[in-house]
Amino acid sequence: MENFCFQDSVSLFITIMVLVLLPRLSLSDTSTYTRPENFYVNCGSDSNVFYGGQTFVGDTNSSTNSVSFTNKGTEVINDQSSVAPEIYRTVRIFRHPSSYKFKLDSLGLHFVRLHFSVVFSRADLLTARFTVSATSGSNHHLKSFSPQNLTNTPRVEEFLLMMNSLEFEIRFVPDHSSLALINAIEVFSAPDDLEIPSASDKNLHTIYRLNVGGEKITPDNDTLGRTWLPDDDDFLYRKDSARNINSTQTPNYVGGLSSATDSTAPDFVYKTAKAMNRSSNEQVGMLMNVTWSFKVKSNHRHFIRIHFSDILSNLSNSDSDFYLFVNGYWRVDVKPSEQPRLASPFFKDVVNVSDGSGLLNISIGTKEANKDAGFLNGLEMMEVLSKSGSDYSNRSSSRVHIITGCAVAAAAASALVFSLLFMVFLKRRRSKKTKPEVEGTVWSPLPLHRGGSSDNRPISQYHNSPLRNLHLGLTIPFTDILSATNNFDEQLLIGKGGFGYVYKAILPDGTKAAIKRGKTGSGQGILEFQTEIQVLSRIRHRHLVSLTGYCEENSEMILVYEFMEKGTLKEHLYGSNLPSLTWKQRLEICIGAARGLDYLHSSGSEGAIIHRDVKSTNILLDEHNIAKVADFGLSKIHNQDESNISINIKGTFGYLDPEYLQTHKLTEKSDVYAFGVVLLEVLFARPAIDPYLPHEEVNLSEWVMFCKSKGTIDEILDPSLIGQIETNSLKKFMEIAEKCLKEYGDERPSMRDVIWDLEYVLQLQMMTNRREAHEEDSTAINSGGSLVAPRLMVSDSFSTNSIFQNGDESKNRFGFTDSSETRVFSQLKISDAR
């Protein structure tokens, strides 16, 4: 009751504060951005020209010392008879390594644009070859150029660079006896609300910027001076799969998470779009998607920002929601229905490593058959630059990051507002709505040939289900399911996800159960449904959730499990008001889950079973905190005569084995990697991926390894564990997790080895606990007379003190606690990662 009252008080406080402060926040978020007059250089000229809404100053006519260039060995060409824009009529030529230097006014993210033109007919210009690099606290290889590869149209190469020094230099280096050239340069600071995720390293080279469904937008019509090209039909795999739509309505910039501002993209982008075009000859009961295919560098990391604004729907309801796919593997929910008004612009950010095909596909897909929801307004795609000067593409980074953009409200930045935002964050975490951006979802919307644009799949019927031939004796009548769930009463709903919904139920014999019901008629999850039944029907283990039965009557897909009283491991680590688990309890839970996975990996008559979706939400706890691994819908059987399995990538983002992502080869070691991420969750009590954290902290495993290299692991530990962990126990536990997270599978331990190591960690902890108990007893016995100091047992192997128990190190270095769910259900919960 006290908790309920507290929740109501919090809700009332939030409501009042939102009403008071929202006008200021909204004004701050949507205020008009004015591009700063930093540096606009007209190279090779002594005169100023106006272009793209800015005045470009001649590089020989600068009245300040803020811009300088290497004058030795340079040459100038001035062709005023050209019909090209005026900034392209002059060019500065370098025959030796040369540079432009800028004295910046501020650090942080900056736009850098280099303008090139080959309108001059000189032979040495047409054969010029040179490279461009930049330095501002770190070096960046920007681009290698050869004008002979360009058209006669002037080209602008745009970069987003993080400036770490006020001294910024752009270097031009001709190849051998060739030369370098430049027509104009722009350097200016980006707006504060332009957030780039740390997963991209914040140093980017723009390769595509499209006004989808609309005309070309010139720099004069963009507050940031960008050029938006129309998405020609060349990008669409099937030209008739989409139609252009446009609107005269002014975009409603509302501010907030993932919401766009007037500087995110021009109004014109949000007034036009391409929408699904379901032709009259489409068969009834089909899922549909539309795909844009882009030529990119192979095996290279890309940052993609996708723009949306619902100018299509008449009503804000779930019928307008659809899926966004990246390269056919990763799915994220796009929910226009969650926007407060129609025509409210928002965006999704993605970081993706391209495969070896040289193509990167972006798709929108329907959620339900016979629906044509789905649209796209704009797209920006940028290559990631490394700080060391080479392209950023390494095997350990072969993963997709789905990031929620954030518009920063600077005008109302007070302590009260920060408190409000934090409470709103907790409120969001408590709500039933899931965050699909956090956990990537695997689904292949495309046909087997690359670049496909449509997947027309009839809704499956289950009359020929292979389960009927297994004679499992696990079928439960649908009438019993209805009775157990009180006709699927929403009051009994305890979880939902990509497959369907989970209900707490009482079976006719009085047994508690968790009933998972697939989304009726969606045609999704059939294979997962059958796989889970086939896997669970052949295994029984103390640390694996048992399947009680299933039902497939009336095209239903219903699974019935034993009821796990204490819910998921995740709920006991973060995101709820449950009491914190002790370090000993956490170790015992890890050992139990490891034993369950080891049992799966132990070859049976048909082969080992690879779980393929190990995560903290798939480890459940019974009333005695006994851990059991759950959710086998993605599991695969691995025969002993196969070295590995080559399959499409499935799983949950944040837990995916990088080698599996790179090669599509699945082994038991993929489960080991995911379990290593779970070990980090257990120790640091935070999600594998949390887009609400600062960019460098979003990915748990990467952040932990960074902190380990800096010797700051103790600063990010779960505060509730401070004073509990014995030094050697912590050290050994981190060693196990690090081994599990090795880049290559053959470097990782088996689950059997992990069990042994975890049991050793538990022994280390228990020895310390017993020693401390003995010391307390000795002190108590001697308290009747003069106090006798306890005799400490010291050895070379074990420390008598936790590294967090004494002195300043025991202080809680966190500024907040994570308490975000108002109600905890005991069940089998489904995440949206399917």
Curated annotation (Swiss-Prot):
Residues 1-28 form the signal peptide. It is found in: Membrane. Glycans are attached at residues 61, 149, 221, 246, 277, 289, 314, 352, 361, 394. The active site is at 613 (proton acceptor). The keyword ATP-binding applies. Keywords: ATP-binding, Glycoprotein, Kinase, Membrane, Nucleotide-binding, Serine/threonine-protein kinase, Signal, Transferase, Transmembrane, Transmembrane helix. It is a single-pass type I membrane protein. One of its GO terms (cellular component) is membrane. The chain crosses the membrane at residues 406-426. This is Probable receptor-like protein kinase At2g23200. It comes from Arabidopsis thaliana.
